[in-house]
Amino acid sequence: MLALLCSCLLLAAGASDAWTGEDSAEPNSDSAEWIRDMYAKVTEIWQEVMQRRDDDGALHAACQVQPSATLDAAQPRVTGVVLFRQLAPRAKLDAFFALEGFPTEPNSSSRAIHVHQFGDLSQGCESTGPHYNPLAVPHPQHPGDFGNFAVRDGSLWRYRAGLAASLAGPHSIVGRAVVVHAGEDDLGRGGNQASVENGNAGRRLACCVVGVCGPGLWERQAREHSERKKRRRESECKAA
């Protein structure tokens, strides 16, 4: 493709010489300067095309989690980030969840995380509305029903692939809220109305609004994920 662009540039240069009546074998200084300018522009365009191709058309989004403004002093202050990547508009969603600030006891407790309908944090996480449920299906079949996450030593770090939510199309979660709950999701098995609406997951501890971003945050988190896996394998080998 770069060769094609350069060929077009040379043809254009020849045409420029013909229009000015100059001998194409000895272009004047104006023609040489024009060729240099055009070459710089073509190079810039080519670099942009290659950068976009390297991104493979993937969509990225980030959500900076902050404690709900309505929490009382006794509640934990959960902070962190949730990152999303979708390789194509119809592809499944991948996500990194990296949160801290949970109580350290009891260890290995589970917390629910869901997408809620509104990106409205004017009244803390309470104003984010119900679960985002564009297809009017029962919980836990909402696209943003991410389920339960194990908390260890006050933090939560997890990679999940194949999520049903999307960053593209009419049911995009961009502009909506991710909410971290105080309790565990009963996955619709609680036997009451709240169970099929929100999984009886308890108070809304922290939340954020999903926003489009570049690939940099995801790439850094992916490198950290790879390093964590490597350290875990090394630790397991030493223990064995």
Curated annotation (Swiss-Prot):
Protein name per its UniProtKB record: Extracellular superoxide dismutase [Cu-Zn]
Listed GO MF terms: copper ion binding; heparin binding; molecular adaptor activity; superoxide dismutase activity
Tissues in which the UniProt entry reports expression: Expressed in blood vessels, heart, lung, kidney and placenta. Major SOD isoenzyme in extracellular fluids such as plasma, lymph and synovial fluid.
Entry similarity comment: Belongs to the Cu-Zn superoxide dismutase family.
Organism of provenance: Homo sapiens (Human)
Cleavable signal peptide: 1-18
Subcellular localization(s) per the UniProt record: Secreted, Extracellular space; Golgi apparatus, trans-Golgi network
Glycosylation: residue positions: 107, 229-230
Cofactor dependency: Cu cation; Zn(2+)
E.C. number(s) listed in UniProt: 1.15.1.1
Role played: Protect the extracellular space from toxic effect of reactive oxygen intermediates by converting superoxide radicals into hydrogen peroxide and oxygen.
Record-linked CDD domains: Cu-Zn_Superoxide_Dismutase
Domain of life: Eukaryota
Site feature: Not glycated: 41, 92, 238
Entry's Gene Ontology BP terms: removal of superoxide radicals; response to hypoxia
Enzyme class: oxidoreductase
Cysteine-cysteine disulfides: 63-208, 125-207
GO CC annotations, alphabetized: collagen-containing extracellular matrix; extracellular exosome; extracellular region; extracellular space; Golgi lumen
UniProt xrefs under Pfam families: Sod_Cu
Keywords: Antioxidant, Copper, Disulfide bond, Glycation, Glycoprotein, Golgi apparatus, Heparin-binding, Metal-binding, Oxidoreductase, Secreted, Signal, Zinc
